[in-house]
Amino acid sequence: MQPENVNANFVLADKIARVVYAETFAKSLRVVEALTSMIFNQSKQNVESIIDIISDYKQFESLCDNSARHNLLDVDSNNREFQMCFRVAMRMLHGNLPDMCNRATKFHRDEFLPKWATARGYVADIDGLLFYQ
């Protein structure tokens, strides 16, 4: 792998990990792997770049300035739970993360019910996140 690719993967993994951390609080490895898998599944299905997906404030509440989760995006990179998110993101970028969310491409927290979810059945419920195909 070229040095510039290593650096690009590091930067992208950091961005993915920050969003995953803010959305999951890194409650468990299972939920971190599931949300990271969902991001990858969405990139395969919609042919969107991962950076476009993790920049979508309509999908990730933490990206909204007025979200209570927004400040979690600034987590210290030495934080243990963030490091877990970072390692999972690197596994995904290197093709070493199996699908941990049953091919899901959407999610929401169990305290919300978006309109798009009312006509669908969820395929996984992991630590308060519901995943959909």
What are the functions of these language-model segments?
Residues 2-133:
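Bacterial extracytoplasmic/cell-wall-associated proteins, especially those involved in peptidoglycan
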